[in-house]
Amino acid sequence: MISKLYSRIAFANTLTRRSFAASSKIFSSSEEAVKDIKDGNTLLVGGFGISGCPENLIRAIRKQGQKDLTVISNNCGIEDVGLGLLLKNKQIKRMIASYVGENKDFEQ
């Protein structure tokens, strides 16, 4: 199925290829992937603790400086890893989590 899709794209006209690229969720960089996140947005973040956590996306958000974020995840990472980076940088306004035990900043 996937190979048929890519075959059609490879031999499609330019307009069709542009249309596919515009709807694709594959980004060339982490910064590009998070550029539409605005101050005050709500983010659902996967992973379990720091395992499977989207580290590159979190670093890109930290670098771009979005603030007043509401974040929903199972925890807030640790001080300098995972969501702990955003918490320490005061970019998270509200954190919804089921476990608070590993991050001293979050426990306060």
Predicted regions and their residues:
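Conserved alpha/beta enzyme-core scaffold
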Residues: I2-Q108
